Swiss-Prot record:
Pathway: Porphyrin-containing compound metabolism; protoporphyrin-IX biosynthesis; coproporphyrinogen-III from 5-aminolevulinate: step 4/4. GO terms for biological process: heme biosynthetic process; protoporphyrinogen IX biosynthetic process. One of its GO terms (molecular function) is uroporphyrinogen decarboxylase activity. It comes from the Bacteria. Substrate binds at residues 23-27, 72, 146, 201, 312. This is Uroporphyrinogen decarboxylase. It comes from Thermodesulfovibrio yellowstonii (strain ATCC 51303 / DSM 11347 / YP87). Its EC number is 4.1.1.37.
Length: 338
């Protein structure tokens, strides 16, 4: 198995910079689109053989240094008694919603048997991959936002109303999701994943004070329960939370493009970093793309180690050939001698 990604997770510099992409298994790939014509999204997630096939596609086509399991961050909710649905042009929908302390009774304990297909897919993949497999889950907070809002939103009014009107109830919800996510990710680890990534996609909607109060303690607790494999913590739009992020004890911090990676390197000394190219750079010219890729690579040179990635998922309009070129560029990039 290729080791560059796992070495970088542990803070070891390798001969080349390892690279993989969030949402690398997805809608921009013709192979994925063919399967999607036959099956709806949830069926693909819930059929281990299909989930494994989709996970393998970008490894074979792009030559990336790690695979990430094809699934969705909302999958565990069905195993807690909620209903999830994916509607074209609307995104994920979650019912019923939890918006008060009284609503917490809706939520059941995570039943791993109901999502056994996730672990079956992992067991298939570890026998077929020649690169490490990354498992993943939403952070307790990001999971909570979907359950409270019922889907995607811009203002998170219901989330913040619950948080500020009934803080004790919100803390209870966070505790429930922390326990469930610990259980879910540890089962992925038992099934064979080599690393896990926690997606805190919506952490950036909070002030530093509220992140410290309502999110940080639960993320720390979650990370500390997962230390048998490297843990990557991804958050979006969180440059203003950087001082809190460095205290999380994640093995790797994955950052988006809204912070210069050189600045992040200076602020997060002795911390492996992942990121942080703007995904939409891939829609531009090769010249503009590689100019920015080089800036990321050089900017991250001072980090303990670096895993090249995007600052968010691959956009649906991205060219497969452009991603291939990007992988080759990163692998072949030579730094000037220090």
């Amino acid at each position: 198995m290729k080791e560059a990604f796992l070495k970088a997770c542990r803070g070891i510099r390798t001969d080349y910079t390892p690279v993989w992409f969030m949402r690398q298994a997805g809608r921009y790939m013709p192979e994925y689109q063919k399967l999607r014509q036959k099956y709806d999204f949830l069926t693909m997630c819930k059929t281990p053989e299909i989930a494994a096939e989709v996970t393998l596609q970008p490894v074979k086509v792009l030559g990336v240094d790690a695979a990430i399991l094809f699934s969705d961050i909302l999958i565990p909710l069905e195993a807690m008694g909620l209903k999830i649905e994916f509607i074209d042009d609307k995104g994920p929908q979650v019912l019923p919603n939890i918006r008060t302390v009284a609503d917490l009774e809706i939520l059941g304990e995570l039943n791993l048997e109901k999502i056994g297909f996730v672990f079956d897919a992992i067991r298939i993949l570890i026998n077929e991959l020649n690169v490490p497999l990354i498992g993943f889950a939403a952070s307790p907070f990001t999971l909570a936002t979907y359950v409270i809002e019922g889907g995607s939103t811009k203002e998170f009014v219901n989330t913040k109303r619950f948080m500020f009107l009934e803080p004790e109830g919100f803390h209870k919800l966070m505790s429930l999701f922390t326990k469930a996510t610990q259980k879910y990710l540890n089962e992925q680890i038992r099934a064979g994943v080599h690393a896990v990534q926690i997606f805190d996609t919506w952490a950036g909607i909070l002030s530093p004070f509220d992140y410290e109060s309502f999110v940080k303690p639960y993320v720390k607790r979650l990370i500390e329960s997962l230390k048998t494999v490297p843990v990557i913590y991804f958050s979006s739009n969180t440059a203003g939370l950087i001082n809190h992020l460095k205290e999380l004890n994640a093995d790797v911090l994955s950052i988006d493009w809204r912070i210069d990676i050189k600045d992040a390197t200076d602020l997060l000394k002795n911390k492996p970093l992942q990121g942080n190219l703007d995904p939409l750079t891939l829609l531009g010219s090769d010249e503009e793309l590689f100019k920015r890729v080089e800036k990321v690579l050089i900017g991250a040179r001072g980090a303990k180690s670096h895993i090249f990635n995007l600052g968010h998922g691959v956009n649906i309009n991205t060219s497969v050939d452009k991603l291939k070129k990007l992988v080759d560029f990163v692998h072949e990039f030579k730094f000037m001698e220090d």
